[in-house]
Design a protein with these regions (language model features):
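Binuclear metal-ion centers of metallo-dependent hydrolases, dominated by the metallo-beta-lactamase
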Residues: 1-37, 52-53, 331, 398-400, ...
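Conserved beta-strand hairpin/beta-sheet module of binuclear metal-dependent hydrolase folds
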Residues: 1-147, 152, 161-259, 352-373
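Di-metal (Zn2+ and/or Mg2+/Mn2+) metal-binding site signature of metallo-dependent hydrolases
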Residues: 255, 261-289
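Catalytic core of the metallo-beta-lactamase
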Residues: 330-384
Length: 713
């Protein structure tokens, strides 16, 4: 007997028995089905649900496409006899089984009565969702919609931590993340816990930056959810110079990073529907430093909350706070960043929207996932699609002007290339291969761009300069000075722009677009994105020594400020504080914040802002409880140590330790922890009100505060 790892580093394993279809998958992380497809293995009959929730921001409980593959691709629904042949077995704790049922219910039975009761569609759209969803749903001989329980078998672990599958196969839980498969008289140990990366099965496309546009689209992925050759559906849409992520496929954060885009550079996310190949990457954006806007309809938003809460094992109310929900109307157009936006409900197995973006010169339509044209005609004949809905879809999808990105996934609930035969300015999505006949529209591949209005890259340069001057506190006239006197250079990925230890004050740098890593002694300490700066430290060091390596992660466009110009700028003074004084304060305080459990990983822009707000406090050995008890005050230990006394006993915090009323307890739940300095100690103090405001803007900080407050009780 042999248990096969999917890949040496992915944290899942596959067991194949002697009987056809007798297989077990241990672990179910994002896009694990694509690893199975790459190996040419059958979809597993049994899924052992993993104990981990996330690994390096990759969700671990993602059963959706494993379910679709087992039921449909393995032929476990008999369409002739209208019944399920074999049920997918899911093994886990009661809580895991509850979560996986929520995910499958809202994703597969997205318009079933039990789901509609939870997502509460408005009265105008509910009849359409009811009727169209029922038409797509598989039914038995009596015309009854096949319920989820007919497709899956939920199996809890036994009290002894084992479960017996069939006659001779037993799976046992060992240590955390470890199992044993016992079959055929043999035992095979399986360990899922590991420290490595969990990459996608496909190669992340590199070498191309997301160049700013006034109006256009940049394809991150357009493959379907089963194809292991590439990423699923995600696009960057530029709306009057604002960057919006349209749909959020698994590993979308990595696709963005390869294009030089961090989450903080997004102006928001727009979601068409909740299927995994369109939302599998959302979990990574639920705990980022910036609370992102999320545009969709109220029905789809409530579906997202249900699914994301189950994936992350959190409450619906909690995940709702990770994004700023912005309702997208479907009954009338709205305006977003100066662009006219018209959304409409598509015709799919779950609530889905198509979207049209339009300025005064051109238009761009995303059809959203939608049933094929012939199928829509048949639905009208069968009374499942109202004539007015059919007319609306024909106009919005097949007779619209401008560019069209069309679903051509070729299935019951997807469109077909022939639906757009002979049309110009149409591109196919949800597939990887263009039909041979040249009259069919081409397929969008990762990296393909459509520029409806390129605009001026110089305008983006000016925006980056303005953002940096705002941080520096420099006068407004410096914006034009830097634009005229600086040099613009572009660097490919892997370029070492400055090297630690070099004596060089030729330039200070502002990033117009792209992403850079900052390394000190070859250790990554920060990532820099557009609107951030580097190279200033050498000008503040009397020896002119560079204190870090800065390496381009993606193609990078830099505004290189000559040393002479930068030295003049350092002496600029606003409200009795020079730029040099502000930068020196940032360089002194930022490392303390950067190394703390609460603020590590925040964008450098946010760390700079906090550094300028903070001050330093020197305390000798003794009681500093009164200072620490002030409302919403936060301290970070820079040097020395303090002792905290809480309900869980004593604790000592050294350098980078965080304490204060905002982090050591939840307001009103427990009394403050007494705090005492153990030796001469230097503290960085953030003023009252800073932390609540930061937590409101940053899901990452909010979650960390909750974690720290529990630890310090």
């Amino acid at each position: 007997m042999r248990v096969q790892p999917l890949n040496p580093a992915v944290g899942a394993a596959y067991w194949q028995g002697e009987a056809v279809g007798d297989s077990i998958l241990l672990g179910g992380f994002s896009e694990v089905n694509k690893w199975i497809a790459l190996r040419g293995w059958a979809y597993p009959h049994t899924l052992i649900l993993p104990e981990a929730v996330q690994h390096r921001q990759v969700p671990q409980l993602v059963p959706e496409f494993l379910f679709y593959g087992f039921i449909f691709r393995e032929g476990n629904f008999d369409f002739a006899r209208k019944r399920v042949v074999r049920r997918l077995r899911l093994v886990g704790t009661p809580r895991q089984l509850e979560r996986v049922r929520d995910i499958l219910a809202v994703s597969y039975l997205g318009t079933a009565p039990e789901v509609l009761a939870r997502i509460r569609p408005n009265e105008d759209i509910r009849p359409h969702l009811d009727r169209e969803g029922a038409y797509f749903a598989l039914k038995d001989d009596w015309g009854r919609i096949v319920p989820l329980e007919d497709y899956i078998e939920l199996i809890p672990w036994g009290e002894d931590g084992t479960v017996t599958l069939d006659k001779s196969v037993t799976v046992a839980r060992a240590d955390e993340g470890a199992y044993e498969v016992r079959a055929e008289g043999e035992t095979a140990p399986v360990k899922l816990a590991y420290d490595g990366d969990q990459p996608p099965v496909w190669q992340v496309p590199t070498g191309k930056a997301d160049v700013p546009r006034r109006f256009g689209v940049h394809t991150l992925g357009s493959y379907d959810g089963f194809d292991p050759r590439g990423p699923s559906v995600s696009f960057i849409v530029w709306l009057d110079g604002h960057r919006v992520l349209l749909d959020c496929a698994p590993y979308a954060d990595r696709l963005l990073e390869a294009r030089g885009v961090s989450p903080e550079c997004l102006d928001g996310i727009m979601i068409t529907h909740i299927h995994e190949d369109h939302t599998g990457g959302l979990a990574a954006f639920a705990q980022v430093p910036k609370r992102l806007k999320l545009w969709t309809t109220p029905e789809i938003w409530r579906s997202i909350q249900i699914k994301l809460a189950a994936v992350l094992d959190r409450s619906v109310e909690d995940v709702a706070n990770d994004f700023e929900f912005c309702p997208l109307p479907t009954d009338e157009p709205t305006t977003l960043f100066g662009i006219r936006v018209q959304a409409h409900y598509s015709c799919h197995s779950v609530p889905t929207i198509g979207i049209r973006f339009e300025n005064d010169k051109d238009a761009l339509t995303f059809t959203g996932d939608i049933a094929g044209r012939d199928y829509l005609d048949r639905m009208v004949q069968d009374g499942a699609l109202a004539p007015e809905r059919h007319a609306l879809l024909m106009g919005r999808v097949y007779r619209t002007s401008g560019y069209v990105i069309a679903d051509a996934g070729e299935a019951l609930i997807h469109g077909y290339p022939k639906d757009h035969f002979g049309r110009s300015r149409v591109y196919l999505s949800h597939r990887s291969v263009t039909p041979v006949d040249g009259s069919f529209p081409p397929v969008l591949h990762p990296g393909y761009e459509i520029a409806l209005d390129s605009g001026e890259v110089n305008a983006h340069d000016l925006s980056a300069i303005k953002a940096v001057l705002s941080q520096w506190g420099a006068k407004a006239h410096w914006r034009e000075n830097l634009r005229r006197k600086s040099i613009v250079r572009e660097f490919p990925p892997g370029s070492v722009i400055v090297s630690q230890g070099d004596t060089d004050t030729s330039y200070a740098y502002i990033i117009s677009y792209g992403l850079c890593n900052v390394l000190v002694n070859k250790t990554l300490v920060a990532k820099l994105h557009e609107g951030e700066f580097f190279g200033e430290a050498a000008f503040l060091d009397e020896r002119g020594i560079r204190n870090a390596d800065v390496v381009a992660v993606s193609p990078v466009r830099l505004i290189c400020v000559p040393g002479k110009v930068f030295r003049e700028l350092l002496s600029d003074e606003v409200e009795h504080t020079s730029v040099e004084e502000r930068l020196r304060k940032i360089l002194k305080i930022r490392p303390t914040l950067q190394n703390s459990a609460l603020f590590a990983g925040l964008p450098v822009t946010q760390l700079n802002e906090l550094s300028l707000l903070a001050d330093e406090v020197e305390v000798g050995p003794g009681d500093i409880s009164k200072e620490a008890e002030k409302a919403d005050v936060c301290f970070v230990v820079a040097e020395g140590s303090v002792n905290l006394t809480g309900a869980n006993g004593h604790g000592t915090l050294g350098p980078s330790g965080v304490f204060g009323s905002g982090v050591t307890w939840r307001a009103g739940s427990v009394r403050p922890c007494p705090v005492r300095a153990l030796r001469p100690t230097r503290l960085v103090r953030l003023p009252a009100g800073t932390l609540p405001e930061l937590a409101r803007r940053s899901p990452l900080v909010r979650h960390r505060i909750a974690h720290l407050s529990t630890r310090h009780r």
